[in-house]
């Protein structure tokens, strides 16, 4: 399978550059299993599309203002994108500079203080910050929001709110779990009234999510790592949902990535079941992989040739996804982080219940 198998042409004007005034006003392309027809709805219609007893699972990670600027001792300008907070005033980061900084070099930060380069960690750098407050708190004032590169404008004050889900609480992401951006408090209240339950996982979206696949042969692609936590309470929620005949719906690809990383075969469940898990994942989901943990997902439209497009193709089938994307382009849907969404149903109904 090749990266080029996942190419499509997108008119640039369909790339959303800013969010709509109302979160839940985004359009929602409902994609049921073949041969049922697509339907054009809005995210605010979700209470009509879901059933009492269904479980929506959100990613509760919180985006940090992870972009910093500074200057090397030589005078060269530096851009820093923090990929992960490591504790003890240390972080792993990408650095953009005319020449790669060496271990031991010091970067004077525009926001005050400095960062020492401790060394390399693969494509990343390890940095130690000399600043007047704990790094996590200091970044709230000193850092800039790392909007995706296809949003061709500087972040504004509104982005501090709108590039964050209303349920974000666990600090650590450098990019938003964008499917969750469509949910506001009013929609959540209506879903509760409908009898839909909510659960949460945490996956800290890393800078690797912005990196393109650099090889055409997908078996040569090295997937980036991200930290996640699927707690015991969420596992129990999923079990209760299955027992009552409810459906499990992931809000975003990061939730699917989390749940599939926590899927384990056991003596009682030879086909696998969800287990509590906290740690790193490098899972790469592409067609040929069977997603067992969810029945449906709410997800935005993804970049051509991206690993996220490969994941949704594994879930619903390549032909179905590309037909849906063609429909979305023809109907002038808005694409990517601040764009519209899909409600995507699995092409293999019942797999989430552990069937082979």
From Swiss-Prot:
GO terms for molecular function: S-adenosylmethionine:tRNA ribosyltransferase-isomerase activity. It comes from Xanthomonas campestris pv. campestris (strain B100). Keywords: Cytoplasm, Queuosine biosynthesis, S-adenosyl-L-methionine, Transferase. GO terms for biological process: queuosine biosynthetic process; tRNA wobble guanine modification. InterPro entries: QueA (IPR003699), QueA_dom1 (IPR042118), QueA_dom2 (IPR042119), QueA_sf (IPR036100). It comes from the Bacteria. Transfers and isomerizes the ribose moiety from AdoMet to the 7-aminomethyl group of 7-deazaguanine (preQ1-tRNA) to give epoxyqueuosine (oQ-tRNA). Belongs to the QueA family. The keyword DNA damage does not apply. One of its GO terms (cellular component) is cytoplasm. Pathway: tRNA modification; tRNA-queuosine biosynthesis. This is S-adenosylmethionine:tRNA ribosyltransferase-isomerase. Its main location: cytoplasm. Pfam families: Queuosine_synth. It is found in: Cytoplasm. PANTHER family: S-ADENOSYLMETHIONINE:TRNA RIBOSYLTRANSFERASE-ISOMERASE.
